[in-house]
């Protein structure tokens, strides 16, 4: 695409919690070169928007309306495939909320609708977190040397029962295709592979409805192996409070450790491998220098991703999170579930058809829940980790 000077006309499908955030970012001017021209949901028009913002109750009508250049899809996961395909088939640009679908088969189907002129992105907003940008910079600089071990204990995604009760689709196979892996931890799995690459295999143990009245996984422990021999452990849960967020990336020349509040960088002189082969000290260790790295994480991650999406449409700016890269984290999440169901190690690349058959069996036995008639107190700032 060539450079476009006109503002990108954006429509938002969905009016739930995250959709409201995208709408605010657009109308409050946090995304330069973009204008909100339409919303879409089965409910009534949202309050407080300018009369120039059209409202539709059917996404197909919105797609055919001609009032948008790009569509943000922020709806329940089970609708992502149909809406996303409609957007791309209409030659509109797509920003999809995570995950891109219930399974990698759905993700691949969606990607097949993209054309060379499509700008298709996924809202993997944690790629804009200065913490992970700094970690990525350090890892790619080879300061850590060859990676040896990656551990991430991510159990501070606590969700109380009301979080599920007020939704008919959350934490159901039919509505979401999974639980903590595809909803909360999909961000962490994306960052894990973005920083350290894709594993070659995974053996996982998922527990279903351990802490909540749900049919999907709400607690996961997984063992990962990588091509160079590195290993990893990933733990995720929505049932622990206060929970832990500890991320360790260990190399033979140093390590990065995020303890939930601070990032530390340790550097070995010489590398562990070199010291191991050359030292005469029976109980010696390489000299290590550890520094605490100051990082200001107070940024609007969603606005940064949306700005990048708009810039890609207008000026061909490379996408921070192309839609295609959503297959990686979704593949890891799917493999962890399949490993649990089959009680065996799963190799990558994951067999999409095999996983889909298992998932479809779960979906066939699943149903959307009846929403509880309760009023939930919502503070979206408390949902981010």
Features from the language model and the residues they span:
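N-terminal Rossmann-like dinucleotide-binding module
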Residues: 1-50
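Conserved SAM-binding strand-loop segment of SAM-dependent methyltransferases
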Residues: 53-59
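Beta-strand-loop-alpha-helix segment that lines the small-molecule cofactor/substrate pocket
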Residues: 70-77, 81-127, 142
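Short, well-ordered coil/turn residues at beta-beta hairpins
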Residues: 74-75, 195, 235, 251
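Predominantly a Rossmann-like dinucleotide-binding segment in NAD(P)-dependent oxidoreductases
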Residues: 127-213, 343
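Glycine-rich phosphate/pyrophosphate-binding beta-alpha loops
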Residues: 186, 211, 235-243
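Active-site beta-strand termini and strand-to-loop segments that position acidic
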Residues: 217, 222-228, 249-251
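C-terminal glycine/acidic-rich active-site capping loop/insertion
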Residues: 253-321, 346, 357-385
């Amino acid at each position: 695409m060539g450079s476009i000077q006109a503002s990108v006309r954006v429509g938002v499908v969905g009016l739930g919690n995250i959709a409201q955030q995208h709408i605010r970012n657009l109308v409050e001017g946090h995304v330069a070169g973009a204008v909100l021209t339409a919303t879409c949901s089965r409910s009534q028009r949202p309050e407080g928007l300018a009369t120039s913002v059209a409202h539709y109750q059917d996404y197909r009508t919105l797609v055919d309306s001609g009032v948008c250049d790009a569509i943000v899809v922020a709806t329940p996961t089970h609708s992502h495939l149909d809406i996303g395909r409609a957007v791309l088939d209409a030659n509109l640009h797509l920003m999809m909320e995570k995950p891109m679908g219930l399974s990698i088969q759905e993700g691949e189907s969606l990607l097949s609708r993209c054309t060379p002129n499509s700008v298709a992105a996924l809202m993997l907003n944690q790629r804009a977190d200065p913490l992970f940008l700094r970690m990525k910079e350090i890892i790619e600089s080879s300061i850590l040397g060859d990676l040896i071990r990656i551990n991430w204990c991510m159990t501070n995604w606590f969700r109380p029962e009301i979080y599920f009760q007020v939704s008919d689709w959350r934490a159901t196979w039919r509505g979401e295709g999974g639980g903590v892996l595809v909803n909360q931890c999909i961000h962490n799995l994306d960052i894990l592979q973005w920083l350290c690459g894709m594993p070659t295999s995974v053996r996982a143990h998922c527990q279903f409805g351990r802490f909540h009245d749900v049919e999907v996984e709400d607690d996961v422990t997984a063992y990962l192996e990588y091509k160079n021999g590195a290993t990893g452990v990933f733990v995720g849960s929505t049932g622990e409070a206060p929970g832990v967020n500890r991320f360790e990336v260990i190399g033979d020349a140093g390590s990065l450790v995020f303890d939930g509040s601070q990032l530390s960088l340790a550097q070995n002189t010489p590398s562990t491998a070199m010291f191991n082969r050359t030292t005469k000290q029976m109980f010696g260790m390489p000299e290590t220098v550890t520094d605490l790295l100051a990082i200001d994480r107070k940024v609007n991650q969603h606005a940064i991703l949306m700005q990048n999406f708009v810039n890609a449409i207008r000026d061909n700016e490379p996408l921070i999170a192309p839609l295609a890269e959503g297959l990686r984290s979704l593949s890891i999440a799917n493999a962890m579930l399949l490993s649990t169901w089959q009680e065996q190690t799963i190799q990558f690349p994951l067999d999409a058809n095999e996983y889909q058959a298992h998932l479809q069996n779960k979906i066939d036995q699943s149903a959307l829940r009846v929403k509880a008639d309760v009023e939930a107190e919502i503070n979206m700032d408390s949902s981010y980790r």
